[in-house]
Each structure stands twice: as structure tokens, then as C-alpha cells.
């Protein structure tokens, strides 16, 4: 048996594809492993990284062989491997039956690794791998961390799927009960939400704030020439204020709201929207966005594909007055953090609703703009963004960049997380305001009894 530990990262996106926020989190994780492995080992001890991914097929949403090859290169260079998890690919993927099967397979892999390594930390990323909590304790060398980034009660308002809610509730209940199961504290809003609506015991938390690989080349601002080339190729008119937006074709992303609320400003701004089609019936929303924009007479460019260079260029383009994030529900929006890095020299100020995790990311008037989620409020927020002076815009962008760099270093966060599991007396590398050092956490045996709130759907 090896004396090193094993880190098993289980994710459905970002290994063989990259089509949503979970994909971005996984890419951040891989970049952190590749660039900061020595730092991680110095702080947490020697370990071998493994990736577990559902069996990829050509039908996988956004399947990209290059993504899979990159993931393999990263972990194999560190002695690990990508592990393919079999499941019934004939059944719908976004259903608890498929997730249950994947969680069983991931738990089996963790147990196998425990026979080869001193300790195993299995991280189940988001809802599909929440079922890992049920298997915690099956092997004394395996600990499980559920890294949830949202819930059905947030993303499926106002009518969340009851089967998905039940799956989430069962996972949190298991994490509360099992001594080697934990839940990642990725941010204040989501943690409060899990406590209030799912009965999460605070003693089950381990701090792992959402972060970015800050030195990644795709997070550096483009040159003005590069941004202009991309913007012009999209047909965006010169000299007109631009409102940018990026999201998938999903009701929760609120792109339809942005289109409607831009109508009173049709003569003032140009809409540059990236609407990434999903792999199901929601993809039809792309045509709806285009038709509705035409009906309202908007000046608009709606791009129906994802190329990371496009939002990067839009965020940094000097004519972009706002990166609008009109979500109906959001834990922590990657685009808020990314825009702060892309637009550090010129370009967009982020405009988002004053709901959920956005106030955790944005202090209104200091590093971005917030608006109340009421009819007409987004229009007012856009007018406010349009009226900003160049000095005001510079002040907001500078503060946004400074805050992200100070608070969202993924390498520091991962080093601290691993140390709390494998070097429990180690002083944390860094922590955010509101995220106490996890080695100072009340031991679960001494923690007060959790207060369970009514399991009601969020209005």
C-alpha cells in the first residue's frame, strides 16, 4: 500500500466537456493541480489525484475529446488517472436513478483506492454525486465531501422537481448522520440555504470557498486589438454602448427578462448575448430569444454557441457598459468573478439582481451594481450603468478586480481544504470573511443540535 493519500474528484462536467458552471469549477481544479501541485503537497502532504466521470459518449452534452485528453494529461502526470464510471446510458441523465447509479460506482472506486492509499478524500461535485454521502463510513480510510453548488429550490423556481428535492434532502440527511461525510461551505448564501431548507447540521461543514485559477491565460484581459477583432467579427456595431450577457438556454438564467427590459432602451444600446443551447428541449429558447428581440426592435447580436474568447472580449470591450446577469436564481455566478478579471483595464461593470448569492459577490456601488428583482428594475439598473462616468466605471472595475484577487484564489482554498483533512493542525493558507478556519470548527460530537426548518420550496 502507498503511504500517500488519494484525492478522488467526481464530476459530470469539465472532464469530457465544459458546458456550464460546474465545468468551469472542474477546469479550475485541473489548472490548480497542474500549476500548483508542489504548493499543495507542501501544505497537505503527498497525494495522488484521480478523476471520476460518467461514461462519456458522443451523446454527452458538449462532448469534446480534447477536454478528456487534457484531463488525462494533468492527472497522469501526477501519478493518477481518469476513471470512467459505467451507468445505463439509455436512461435520462438528469434524474436521481442515474445519479444513484453513479454514486454507487464512485463509492466503489473510493473503496478500491483505500486499498492502495493511506487515506482517500472523495469529492462529489454537485447534485449528481450527492449520493456519495450515503456511502460514507463504508471504509474507515475514506472521507466524503459533497461540493454542492446549487439546489433545485434555487435553480427551478417556482416549481422545483420534487424528485430532485428528495434526492438532495436524503443526501444532506446522510451527511448529518455519517461521521466521515461532510458538506463544502462554498459561500454564505448557499450554506444558509442548506441549513434553512435542508436541515444541514453546521458541524458537517468544511470550508471550501468558490474560487478561480487566477493566473490562467483565459482569465487575462485580451488586448484591445484582440477584443476588437472578436467584437467586429460578431457584427457588433461600432460606437454604440453594449450590454453583454452570457448564459445557457435555461429559464433560471433570465435571458428572457433581459430582452424584455431592454425594450425601452432599444435606441440607446446594443445587446450582445451569448445563449448556449442545452442538450434538451430548452435549446429551443435560443430561437425564442432571437424572435422576441426582433419583435421588440432591439439592436441585438445573439450568439448560439460557447467560445470562451467571446465573453472575454465582450467584458473587456471599452463600449460594453454592463455585463448583465439577470438570473432568477444563482448561488455564485462565475461570470461575475471572471468579468472582474477580464475588465480590469476597460469594459464592463457587472449588473445583477439583489438576490441569493449576488450580494456576496457585489457590494452595490462599490464593485458593481445591484437591482431589486422587480418589474422595471433591470431597465433602471441598465440606465444607471449607462449614466456612469468614466471615472466611476474605473473605480468600480478596479474594486471588483482587487476583491476577486484577494478573495478567490482557488489554489489557496484547495491547499487549505486538503490540509484540514490530512494535516488537521495546519494553519489555513487563507480564508474569506465569514468562513472560519475549519480546524477551529466545533467537533461534531460537541456541536449543538441542528435546528431543522420546514422543507418548503423557495418562493
Task: Locate each region found by the language model.
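Conserved acidic donor-binding segment of nucleotide-sugar-dependent glycosyltransferases
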Residues: 364-365, 369-376, 384-390
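Aromatic "clamp/platform" in nucleotide-sugar-dependent glycosyltransferases that forms part
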Residues: 328
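A charged, aromatic-enriched C-terminal amphipathic alpha-helix characteristic of glycosyltransferases
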Residues: 373, 390-427
Amino acid at each position: 500500500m502507498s503511504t500517500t493519500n488519494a484525492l478522488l474528484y467526481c464530476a459530470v462536467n469539465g472532464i469530457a466537456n465544459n458546458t456550464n458552471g460546474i465545468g468551469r469549477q472542474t477546469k479550475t481544479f485541473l489548472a490548480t493541480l497542474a500549476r500548483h501541485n508542489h504548493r499543495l503537497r507542501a501544505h497537505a502532504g503527498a497525494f495522488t489525484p484521480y478523476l471520476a466521470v460518467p461514461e462519456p459518449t458522443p451523446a454527452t452534452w458538449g462532448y469534446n475529446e480534447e477536454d478528456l485528453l487534457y484531463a488525462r494529461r494533468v492527472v497522469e502526470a501526477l501519478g493518477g488517472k481518469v476513471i470512467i464510471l459505467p451507468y445505463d446510458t439509455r436512461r435520462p441523465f438528469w434524474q436521481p436513478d442515474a445519479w444513484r447509479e453513479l454514486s454507487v460506482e464512485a463509492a466503489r472506486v473510493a473503496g478500491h483506492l483505500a486499498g492502495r492509499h493511506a487515506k482517500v478524500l472523495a469529492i462529489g461535485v454537485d447534485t449528481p454525486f450527492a449520493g456519495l454521502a450515503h456511502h460514507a463510513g463504508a471504509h474507515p480510510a475514506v472521507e466524503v465531501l459533497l461540493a454542492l453548488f446549487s439546489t433545485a429550490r434555487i435553480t427551478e423556481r417556482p416549481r422545483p422537481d420534487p424528485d430532485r428535492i428528495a434526492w438532495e434532502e436524503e443526501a444532506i440527511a446522510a451527511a448529518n448522520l455519517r461521521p466521515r461525510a461532510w458538506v463544502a461551505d462554498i459561500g454564505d448564501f448557499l450554506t444558509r440555504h442548506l441549513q434553512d431548507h435542508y436541515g444541514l447540521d453546521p458541524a458537517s461543514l468544511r470550508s471550501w470557498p468558490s474560487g478561480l485559477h487566477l493566473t490562467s491565460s483565459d482569465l487575462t484581459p485580451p488586448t484591445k486589438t484582440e477584443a476588437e477583432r472578436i467584437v467586429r467579427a460578431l457584427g457588433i456595431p461600432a460606437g454604440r454602448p453594449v450590454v453583454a450577457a452570457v448564459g445557457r438556454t435555461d429559464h433560471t438564467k433570465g435571458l428572457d427578462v433581459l430582452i424584455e427590459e431592454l425594450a425601452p432602451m432599444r435606441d440607446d444600446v446594443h445587446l450582445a448575448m451569448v445563449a448556449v443551447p442545452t442538450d434538451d428541449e430548452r435549446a429551443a429558447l435560443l430561437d425564442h430569444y432571437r424572435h422576441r428581440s426582433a419583435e421588440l426592435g432591439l439592436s441585438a447580436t445573439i450568439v448560439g454557441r460557447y467560445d470562451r474568447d467571446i465573453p472575454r472580449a465582450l467584458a473587456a470591450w471599452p463600449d460594453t457598459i454592463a455585463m448583465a446577469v439577470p438570473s432568477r436564481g444563482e448561488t455564485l455566478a462565475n461570470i461575475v468573478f471572471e468579468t472582474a478579471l477580464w475588465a480590469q483595464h476597460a469594459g464592463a461593470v457587472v449588473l445583477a439582481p439583489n438576490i441569493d448569492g449576488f450580494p456576496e459577490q457585489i457590494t452595490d456601488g462599490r464593485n458593481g451594481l445591484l437591482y431589486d428583482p422587480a418589474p422595471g428594475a433591470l431597465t433602471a439598473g441598465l440606465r444607471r450603468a449607462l449614466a456612469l462616468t468614466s471615472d466611476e466605471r474605473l473605480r468600480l472595475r478596479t474594486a471588483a478586480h482587487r476583491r476577486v484577487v484577494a478573495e478567490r484564489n482557488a489554489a489557496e482554498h484547495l491547499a487549505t481544504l486538503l490540509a484540514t483533512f490530512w494535516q488537521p493542525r495546519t494553519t489555513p493558507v487563507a480564508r474569506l470573511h465569514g468562513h472560519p478556519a475549519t480546524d477551529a470548527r466545533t467537533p461534531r460530537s460537541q456541536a449543538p443540535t441542528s435546528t431543522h426548518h420546514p422543507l418548503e420550496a423557495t418562493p
